[in-house]
Amino acid sequence: MHNSEATETIYKEIYQLEPAHYMVITKNNIVKNKYWNPLKDVKPLKLKNHDEYVKRFLEIFEEAVKCRLRTVGQVGIMVSGGLDSGSIAAIASKELKKEEKVLKGYSFLPIESYSNKIVNHRIADESEYVNILKNYCGNLDITYCRNDNINSLTNIDELIGIFEQPIKTLENSYWVTGMAKQSSEDGVKVLLIGQNGNVSISFGDFFIHIQTLIRQLKFGEVISEVNAANKRYGKPKKAIYSTIISNAIPYKIKKIRHRKEDTIENKFEDSVIKLDLIKKYNVEERFDKKGYNSVITKVGTLKETRKSILDEATLAHIGIMETKDSLAYGIIKRDPSKDKRIMEFCLSIPSEAYVHEGEERYLIRSSMVGILPEEIRTNWRNRGIQSADWVERLLPDWDKTKNQVKEALMDNEVKKYVDIEKVEGLLEKYDDISNCQNRNEVKLILIPLVFYKFIKQYREMLDFQYDI
């Protein structure tokens, strides 16, 4: 997130229109209206059985994919070994085959020296599953993007220019833009993505489902779901119930119990902004209102979760980044999992359509029978993780990077915003990052450097304007 409010930008007195709004400007006034409000307008959908939900979902999903394939050029997709991009790829490749076109897939690979292939059921190298998908679809051409000799800072000046602001998502910068560039060079005009899938087509969190059942007083179903999850995943019932009880404690009580930990210092531990600025601009209060940076775990019901899914600041951030990325590389990113019809359907169905007999992401898994290979559809244990090697990529140039950070910390503008002492402490701690234990702290070291690079670009732009 680069902004906490949907209308904010980093530029003083420059604002942006919120998602799902339109503005009419006349010489007399400015009128702004919200034209899409699904939490208010979308009614609950109750069908006879799960098969009916699957049938309705597939009708909408297939059309959402199909209508995004229109282009005079090639169609590509950012594909992993997971459910979201895999489902989109399976349907898109089938449709393109009718037009005698091939779907061009682009998949991330970590550098060859990266050794942690699977950590805590997260897979860094998903090529095994991507190859399974490729062979199953038969109309999917895969280009693996390892992006050797590229790290999070290599193209950072270019990215700052594209996005017109400092880049916070450093971990993803080198492979996301790398794929966009490669696909553009290959003649791709439409690049499919499945970024929104986790909150739409493949939504389905076990503990959110349990919270929903508890709120509905369906305790018998809670017991059944716990028993099923125990059998499916092998997790002890005691551990499952312990988490359920912890989640069920009202948030206000949790705040009282953990008031010593619920401090501004802890909330902004993962930030290098000066605390006095955070206080000056009421950032803590604004974040609390939106549920950002909470040190206390809060698991809501499905209804409560849907409010956060439609957070306007988040949607604005995603939309702006995708649009500017697309404009820079001459492609159009299209996300079928963010289709308006898909979102409305997914916001209308009951919790049991998403989680069933302990199985998470049940809607997409049950809908993709015969469409996705079973190795992907029934992969309950492992999930992919992109950018797993981002710190390792920094190693060859780390000494140079540290010197650049030190230079940034000397800049007067940077000093106004950044907690210099905190960053200097992290620099001392991570003089060597070969055995890094906390990757987020390495990211905190880099953020002042990225900010400094933005400031330098801004100064150069002003100097150019004055010269003219």
Regions found by a protein language model. Name each.
Residues 1-148, 155-162, 177, 449:
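Cysteine-centered catalytic environments shared across enzyme families
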Residues 12-19, 29-30, 187-188, 247, ...:
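Adenosyl-5′-phosphate
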Residues 47-58, 165-169, 304-309, 332:
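Short acidic-aromatic active-site loops that bind/stabilize oxyanions
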Residues 67, 91-98, 182, 186, ...:
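Active-site catalytic microenvironments for nucleophilic, acid-base chemistry
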Residues 83-85, 110-113, 148-152, 196-200, ...:
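Short, solvent-exposed loop/turn segments at secondary-structure junctions
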Residues 120-123, 159-162, 204-215, 463-467:
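Short secondary-structure boundary/capping segments
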Residues 149-173, 177, 265-288:
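Mobile, glycine- and charge-enriched loop segments
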Residues 169-170, 177-253, 318-342:
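Active-site adenylate/phosphate-handling loop in enzymes that bind or generate adenylated species
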